[in-house]
Amino acid sequence: MSVEVINPDGLSKPDMYRQVSVAVGTRHVFIAGQVARDADGRPVGGDDLAAQTEQAFRNVAIAIESVGGSFDDIAKLTVYVVDWSPEKMAALGEGRCVRR
């Protein structure tokens, strides 16, 4: 199987990997782990979990839209939070989903 790799505009451009991988001839798209960083790789949100969540979801939107998809097309999304505690759940939910 052939794989197309993409670094979409609007996301940082890492040297070691690509942000999006598409299994050619299928509808399977794999997005690299998205964190609270802007297109230039600068951290966004500081210690504000809601702001970090918003940026990470914005990055997911950019990645999936780069191949013609939307959040409606995502089958699985895994979220990792450093130093998780149940008290952080409300802040995690404050991250607003970005629609264009």
Regions found by a protein language model. Name each.
Residues M1-R100:
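Short, polar/acidic, helix-capping and beta-turn segments at strand->helix junctions
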